[in-house]
């Protein structure tokens, strides 16, 4: 850069993907007082990201760094739970989601374009990188209670704990030795996440009901995460986000018949994230790119049809 030359940075990001779950479930009723259930769940996930970080120089030229990442994973999980009815108007429940081991494959590549005058410009391409590994998700458990108000409605509360700080990376042989740095970092910067849900249902008729609820999840990472962020990777996508707490507002309807049932729900998920284009810990004051707060609202529609045999 020339003396007194300024830099104008900008950033572009596009994400896409899906997360599918397929379940095989069993449930049992014991004297109308104890209800038990279990399910085997198959997960299929894909995530893609295209990003570009650009710097335009005030005197001449500029540079850009483009990145592509595709991550795919499959896993099998197990969930078990139960409901106990100590009195006709009280329900107490608990469930456990065992850690899921995902078999994961990452593919990434990048290119850097530079322009510093008529005779000094070009593009440099990285070789395509791929990485195969396994990721073990945390243990998740739920506790719940519900109070039934006659034949017209109920109020329920639920607590969920996800021990995010116990997740870990492993190689294809389920050995985590080569990922000691990454796994130690997970334990240092991730929190055990707590979620509280409160909801209610009112029966308009014997078959039709309306529902509403609210949920709150604490921050999944510690506040000092940004200061301790030191990625150990040969990838060149340097951006990352530090998430805050999450709120959910829900509403829905349900219809119950003798042989079938239909449920429809709307979930509005809201959270903020602090965006960093790169790790600014070692950048001198006055040269750091400003952070940005990204506010996300995710509206989901869920429909379920159940058949009784």
Q: What feature does the model see in each segment?
A:
Residues 1-309:
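Outer-membrane beta-barrel porins/channels
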